[in-house]
């Protein structure tokens, strides 16, 4: 975790450890005619990326250029921005408190401009400031100032990326987040699997388990500080909760028979999962305080892969009770169970969007695995991407982007992580140092 301070000009505001930044509006010291604010409409499907100039932040050493590179990479990968090459820049920014020469930026067709500076304070902290400018409107849109330790510069770059995304799209960014996944090493028939966590852009990977047991389906807690996952030791399934920072973990459930897909409830008080008892696989919840287990489904079918709606009132899951794998929705009490998928093929791994408006899924049809979305009532089904083997969608916290894993064919093939936005137009590989499967996207870091 990092201690970040955010400062309003003339009024310091120190955040507590593990708090996100507070908004900051920098004073604009010059009058401009009122114009419509620069905005990207991300609700209209495929959009032309906004040309944006992101200058190297002014300051000593390489940290300013490094931060600029992280911000450029974040925004470019979103598919909504087109960072312009620095070689095309006419104005060389040396003081961010001086109004830019907007004409120089219009010449290179930039519509937005990011400037910034870094400075080491006498107490050893790193101070970072940035400004976001509307080039055509010739006005400052936002600005923030941070104080942090020098080794946390990368997270500050993610926070700045989120601020830019928010100001220009009107929606929350997702760059100050992490991904937990199962890293896979070794030959295909004897893979060693370890839980690994990394920043959403692939940097700072860190192993969380040693690889001495099979690990599956890691999922974040709502505060992003814990992970629940399934591990097999001596062929016995156990459900764990792992503290990411301390590495401490506890067994919260050890169940006879098969266990699948543990996941936190939105309030973090329960874990929902599929347990096999009496030959049936049904959906159960466990209260993490009392350890009381409650059964929600009771059929002769296989019910698995449960996921709560963001308000905790409903649950989606997969079941073959109708003869093939399909997606169902029920109330959180287990009542009102109904099927919502009716397209061709089989459906699996449903997961509710953080916005509540969509359910993502894996669909197997015609020998191909597709990632798609539908509304919670089953209408509006859309395929986002397909291929030989795509599986395991997980949502970014703003509900605009999904990550999943894709298998490649052959003896040397293996799984890798990919992302795609809800339009299906912006699909990207997500870098990992090893083969990688079963990703889970964190909420915003607290």
UniProtKB/Swiss-Prot annotation:
Source organism, top-level taxon: Bacteria
Protein name: Tol-Pal system protein TolB
InterPro entries: 6-blade_b-propeller_TolB-like, PD40, Tol-Pal_TolB, TolB_N
Lineage, opening ranks: Bacteria, Pseudomonadati, Pseudomonadota, Alphaproteobacteria, Hyphomicrobiales
PANTHER family: PROTEIN TOLB, PROTEIN TOLB HOMOLOG
Entry keyword set: Cell cycle, Cell division, Periplasm, Signal
A single GO BP: cell division
Subunit-structure text: The Tol-Pal system is composed of five core proteins: the inner membrane proteins TolA, TolQ and TolR, the periplasmic protein TolB and the outer membrane protein Pal. They form a network linking the inner and outer membranes and the peptidoglycan layer.
